[in-house]
Amino acid sequence: IIVLDADNNVLSDNIPYRYDGNIWSFDSNNDEGKTTIYYDNKATVYLAYFPYSKEADNVINIDDLKGKFLPQGDQRSKDAYRASDLLVWSDTSGRPLKKLDIVFEHAYSLLSLSPSIKCKINGRRDFTYVPSSISDVSFNVGTEPLFPYQMNDGSYQIIISPKRAKVRWLYEYNKEMYSGAMPDTDLSANTCYTFTPVLKDIGDYTLDKAQMGDFYCKDESNNG
């Protein structure tokens, strides 16, 4: 958390807090000599962000924060993906506050790609899934390839700076390369853009079409 006065002088400089699932509390284990924030009647601007970094010391606005947390080009690891997802909040009401009602927003845009197989379950319900044989996934928003993180649901996601851009994607499936693109679009912060190209429609999914890695599930009526 960062607190400023009306002249943008820093009153509380990049103070770390932790969240336990219920409440925020000062991180007393920080080794930077920082102390908790107290009410100050000179305070007029409050900034909060996540994840914490000591590199944000002396920052006085959201744009400066973004400069410290640029999205990484290779987000294939969980650490790189999370480090790219800057969350921000600010209160510029010009009055001192005794309580901060922080509601974070994503500072950047999110691209999500789910190349899918389409089928019907029990001949009636449409269903799509991302096959496990998808590989070598990348996005292009300019000249350099960007490498996304694979989520638990199989989708490939990458965080990028908001801008006007033409998004392209590329991936391999069954030893063939597939590509697609979205036309020039003004990408907005705190917004997810989802792409769901259908690789093929296999119609009714029956056991004779089962492949390694498929899951077998039953509904509440015990139907497979």
Language-model-detected regions and their locations in the chain:
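Short, low-hydrophobicity acidic/polar segments
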Residues: 1-120, 162-163, 180-181, 186-191, ...
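Intrinsically disordered, low-complexity regions
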Residues: 34, 118, 131-134, 204
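Contiguous ligand/interfacial binding patches
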Residues: 123-192
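Disulfide-bonded cysteine-rich modules in secreted/extracellular proteins
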Residues: 202-215
